[in-house]
């Protein structure tokens, strides 16, 4: 079965380009991905860096303003957030932001949403971080506000957590009826139900082929109960990748690239690594489990030859 490929920039920490402007490097990577045939580029929406990726004090530009700048710097490639915590911004303001970026990009935006999980990040910025049940209900209401603001001439929504009244959002997004919504997370009772009810895509944060197949089976069940189309939901997986010609290069790269906030077993568990042949075999197992779209990330993404090798030697096998 075919699969598509997007690229995530998990960080704006570029050790081999430390003296360059961080956004300039990110833009160069995005433009290279566009030239190589990647379908999309994704940015994390965090307020500062998370330790399993890089030190907290490393640069991490704000997601949506960066996506707007990337939209103005590209012509074809789709652009998305992976993912935005519902509690970071008022959903009515986020609707305005995303509508604008969809106009700037001429209809290339994908809006990734999640409930949020970094309690210390919310607290550092003075944002509420309620218990998980409340965060899930706020996520659902936030999506409802987005849909209202994107599609209604004057939006009104009365929820427990969010309200908009006769709100005008103009210009509307280019994409009709609205930009696609991606929901991230593997929560089986609520997250997957929200995907089944509202979203056009779902992101699996990782997992073995067997785990992915099981989670997608739960999603299918939610779709059946709600009467929505499981096949119309794009099944994506965040997939860190590390190219290595042999075990010696693999060990050396792990030593160099494993973040201080992680460890080698965790790094190996979440990263698909090896030669193009070995990586392709591992990706094929995930395709067989139901994954349709890989959002790959490279720990050394600023070394653009990695992107070129992957695009030349791996991506065509899934065309």
Where are these regions (language model features)?
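Active-site-adjacent structural elements that line small-molecule/cofactor binding pockets in enzymes
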Residues: 1-319
């Amino acid at each position: 079965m075919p699969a598509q490929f997007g690229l995530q920039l998990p960080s704006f920490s570029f050790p081999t380009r430390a003296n360059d402007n961080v956004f300039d490097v990110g833009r160069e990577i995005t433009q290279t991905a566009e030239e190589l045939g990647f379908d999309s580029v994704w940015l994390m929406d965090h307020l500062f860096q998370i330790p399993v990726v890089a030190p907290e004090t490393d640069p991490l530009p704000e997601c949506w303003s960066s996506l707007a700048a990337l939209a103005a710097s590209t012509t074809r490639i789709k652009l998305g957030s992976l993912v935005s915590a519902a509690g970071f911004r008022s959903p009515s303001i986020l609707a305005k932001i995303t509508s604008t970026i969809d106009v700037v990009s001429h209809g290339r935006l994908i809006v990734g949403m999640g409930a949020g999980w970094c309690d210390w990040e919310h607290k550092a910025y003075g944002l509420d971080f309620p218990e998980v049940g409340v965060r899930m209900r706020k996520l659902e209401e936030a999506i409802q506000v987005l849909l209202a603001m994107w599609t209604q001439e004057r939006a009104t929504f009365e929820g427990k957590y969010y309200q908009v009244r006769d709100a005008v959002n103009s210009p509307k997004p280019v994409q009709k009826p609205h930009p696609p919504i991606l929901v991230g997370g593997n929560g089986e009772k609520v997250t997957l139900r929200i995907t089944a009810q509202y979203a056009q895509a779902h992101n699996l944060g990782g997992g073995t082929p067997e785990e992915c197949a099981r989670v997608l089976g739960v999603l299918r069940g939610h779709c059946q109960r709600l009467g929505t189309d499981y096949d119309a939901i794009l099944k994506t997986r965040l997939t860190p990748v590390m190219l290595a010609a042999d075990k010696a290069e693999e060990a050396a790269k792990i030593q160099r690239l494993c973040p201080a906030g992680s460890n080698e077993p965790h790094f190996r568990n979440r990263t698909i690594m090896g030669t193009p042949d070995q990586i392709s075999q591992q990706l094929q197992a995930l395709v067989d489990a139901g994954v349709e779209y890989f959002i790959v990330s490279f720990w050394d993404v600023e070394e653009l030859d990695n992107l070129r090798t992957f695009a030349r030697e791996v991506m065509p096998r899934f065309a």
